[in-house]
């Protein structure tokens, strides 16, 4: 979808861009697939802030998306492409021949009227979901399971894709969007193709208010705080912090590796590539 810009009627309007919604064919969601969504404001059950800079934003209804793709052997027709406020990609409404309706992530190139299917006998076509053992090496996939039957957890955001590099015994080697190469059980399901709405990464919000609509509150720098609030705080006048970047709790940040999960280390062949 093309990026849409606006006439500069205000200073922020000058830089504001949106992804064109010409691909969306249905404005209201399927009622049977909508649930209410409670907002936390970044607080846990005791009322304390556990995720900073979260609050406010437009009210959203949750669309129940099928990440498991476990309806094997039953063909479905794409009935509509819809907007989902809870994720960066579009969602596709499927009408199965047995009458059931489900939402899935819309792969790039999936259009209304196309037929798709899940299961080990499905063809290698965009939108079809198969176990990794039935997908040829080199295929682009998304919505990949980490555990068989749990539902897709990797490569789900707009424009994301992973590549099936090879299979060794009962494990498949995948190159993930981060550059990481990871082993996954060949029984895990994956969907063929790249997630749609590829131009999402090129959008410029243009103004702070648009970030507030998304439920994000202002992010404060540590150097602008007092010493009681942040390790970078204090000093006479403007300072650079005086030390290597750390979090408010003293943990080194900006490139410092904090991963500590020995249980799953054996599944990772190469760590994700560094940002340049």
Curated annotation (Swiss-Prot):
Protein name per Swiss-Prot or TrEMBL: Large ribosomal subunit protein uL2
Signal peptide range in chain numbering: none
Region (Disordered): 1-50, 206-276
Keyword Endoplasmic reticulum belongs to the record: no
Record keyword DNA-binding present: no
Chain intervals with Basic and acidic residues compositional bias: 20-38
Entry's Gene Ontology BP terms: cytoplasmic translation
Function, as annotated: One of the primary rRNA binding proteins. Required for association of the 30S and 50S subunits to form the 70S ribosome, for tRNA binding and peptide bond formation. It has been suggested to have peptidyltransferase activity; this is somewhat controversial. Makes several contacts with the 16S rRNA in the 70S ribosome.
Family according to the record: Belongs to the universal ribosomal protein uL2 family.
Start-end of Polar residues biased regions: 7-19
Name of the gene encoding the protein in the UniProt record: rplB
Annotated keywords: Ribonucleoprotein, Ribosomal protein, RNA-binding, rRNA-binding
GO CC, one annotated term: large ribosomal subunit
Record-level Gene Ontology MF annotations: rRNA binding; structural constituent of ribosome; transferase activity
